[in-house]
Each structure stands twice: as structure tokens, then as C-alpha cells.
Amino acid sequence: MNANKQRQYNQLAHELRELQTNLQETTKQLDIMSKQCNENLVGQLGKVHGSWLIGSYIYYMEQMLGKTQ
């Protein structure tokens, strides 16, 4: 193999190692983002369900039993 071809392969190998490192870091960051989104989403869903429960209780009390607060 000539020197020029060897230099090109060495450069390609270096760039592939750098790409692998960047992909690993990107994967770590995506995992962190996914965990944060899931935690926030679960919290938001809990708030929405709680609001629905309270709203339906108030509606029931006002409409079905004739009570107002």
C-alpha cells in the first residue's frame, strides 16, 4: 500500500473514532433527555387527572345534588 493511501486510511480511522465518541455522547444526552421528559410527563399527567377528578366532583355536587360552594 502506498504512503498516500495509508495516510487516507489513518485519517478515516481517526474520523471514525471521533464519530463513535460523538455518537456515544449523543446517546447519553438523549437518554438523559428521555428520562427528564418521562418524569415531567408523568407529573403533568398526574396533575391533569387530579384536575379532572376535582372538576368532576364539583360538577357532581353542583348538578346532581344541587349544592354550590
Curated annotation (Swiss-Prot):
Keywords: Cell cycle, Cell division, Centromere, Chromosome, Chromosome partition, Coiled coil, Cytoplasm, Cytoskeleton, Kinetochore, Microtubule, Mitosis, Nucleus
An example Gene Ontology CC term for this record: DASH complex
Any one GO BP annotation for this protein: positive regulation of microtubule polymerization
Keyword Isomerase: no
Function: Component of the DASH complex that connects microtubules with kinetochores and couples microtubule depolymerisation to chromosome movement; it is involved in retrieving kinetochores to the spindle poles before their re-orientation on the spindle in early mitosis and allows microtubule depolymerization to pull chromosomes apart and resist detachment during anaphase.
Record note on quaternary structure: Component of the DASH complex consisting of ASK1, DAD1, DAD2, DAD3, DAD4, DAM1, DUO1, HSK3, SPC19 and SPC34, with a stoichiometry of one copy of each subunit per complex. Multiple DASH complexes oligomerize to form a ring that encircles spindle microtubules and organizes the rod-like NDC80 complexes of the outer kinetochore. DASH complex oligomerization strengthens microtubule attachments. On cytoplasmic microtubules, DASH complexes appear to form patches instead of rings.
Protein's name according to its UniProt entry: DASH complex subunit HSK3
UniProt organism field: Saccharomyces cerevisiae (strain ATCC 204508 / S288c) (Baker's yeast)
